[in-house]
Amino acid sequence: VNEMKQHEYNPAHIHRGMLFTGLSSVMILKLPSTFGREYSADQIQQNGRLQILGAANGQFAKIDYQPPMDLRDFYIFPYDMRHCVYPFNGTTETRRTLAANCDVDFDPIKNRGAN
């Protein structure tokens, strides 16, 4: 369980497990009633929000995704997908999430067929 208070943040990172392939996840358990004043961009709210950062380049590629957050939302993404959480302000309430990771035993040679 991760708890964040105002002005705290979780910098961009990835997860690893015992295997090369795996999944990370986050479930939203509690959100503050406000994330406070936006300092970076009023039109795109970022305070206290999860941002998933892709590795794609190109004119039609979306390099990041900021999912809408509601209580009990559950997001699953690959281990090696960078992600971060921005700080929030203006409240003493807590942002609480549950994070979980799991290895995926995948063999690309054995799993090539369309069986």
Language-model-detected regions and their locations in the chain:
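A short alpha/beta connector and helix-capping loop motif
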Residues: 91-102
